[in-house]
Amino acid sequence: MNTRISFLATLIFGILIVSYSIAGAEDGETLFKSKCGQCHKNGGEAPVFSPVKFASSQWERFFKREKHKRKKDISGIIPSDEQASIKQYLIDHAADSDLPIAAGLQ
């Protein structure tokens, strides 16, 4: 009986973690399109790009060095928690990732 309960608890916990990871990725994608897409679009004030523009280590460096601030400070536009979701989305789908996404903003 205890073995079954432990197994079910572990299974449910695993499903919740996977669901949370998938939801986080979707949030990052949605934020990338809605927030970054305000400027990074065809005819926009910034160039169009996709997650595969850089390798994951390059995205890490981009955010660590706050390179976006050189052109425009986005801290007043995109809160830090949303920036973290966007960063994770870009890293998860970078050129060297297991799930690269070439579709960019339009």
Residue ranges of predicted features:
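Bacterial N-terminal signal peptides that target proteins for export
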Residues: 1-9
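Electrostatic cytochrome c docking/interface patches
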Residues: 14-31
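Inter-heme linker and motif-flanking segments adjacent to c-type heme-binding CXXCH motifs
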Residues: 45-48, 97-99
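The canonical Cys-X-X-Cys-His
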Residues: 33-43, 86
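C-terminal capping alpha-helices of c-type cytochrome domains
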Residues: 76-106
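Non-transmembrane alpha-helical segments in soluble domains
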Residues: 33, 60-63, 87, 91
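N-terminal, post-signal-peptide region of Sec/Tat-exported proteins
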Residues: 46-81
